[in-house]
Amino acid sequence: MAKLTNEDILNAIADMSVMNVVELVSAMEEKFGVSAAPVAAPPVVADTIDDVVVEKDEFDVMLTSFGKKKVAVIKMARSITGLGLKEAKDMVESAPVVIKEGASKVEAEDIQKQLEEAGASVELK
């Protein structure tokens, strides 16, 4: 019996019809007890939790309470948002409310400091 090379086998398969190749694959699965189904790649897992933690770069400034100095907080809210007196008053009185969305860390901390100095309770989210 002549020894078949990989090249001979590949040429023989290349000359086969698609149906014959499917039958050949099925026969090989039965004979060798394997499956030709693709194996799913294992999920990529970060080496450490530090790789997963991403520092947030945009913050929402949330007014949680206006405290005892409502007028001072309304004035500060007006200067931060550019709203009119009535709109700023309504916003402050509807606390908890977002005063500024998508602020940078420095800007958000500055707004938080200003509002807290005016007597408000503020959270950064």
UniProtKB/Swiss-Prot annotation:
Disulfide bonds: none annotated. It comes from the Bacteria. Keywords: Ribonucleoprotein, Ribosomal protein. One of its GO terms (biological process) is translation. InterPro entries: Ribosomal_bL12, Ribosomal_bL12_C, Ribosomal_bL12_C/ClpS-like, Ribosomal_bL12_oligo, Ribosomal_bL12_oligo_N_sf. It holds the Pfam family Ribosomal_L12_N. One of its GO terms (molecular function) is structural constituent of ribosome. One of its GO terms (cellular component) is cytosolic large ribosomal subunit. Forms part of the ribosomal stalk which helps the ribosome interact with GTP-bound translation factors. Is thus essential for accurate translation. Belongs to the bacterial ribosomal protein bL12 family. Homodimer. Part of the ribosomal stalk of the 50S ribosomal subunit. Forms a multimeric L10(L12)X complex, where L10 forms an elongated spine to which 2 to 4 L12 dimers bind in a sequential fashion. Binds GTP-bound translation factors. This is Large ribosomal subunit protein bL12. It comes from Ruthia magnifica subsp. Calyptogena magnifica.
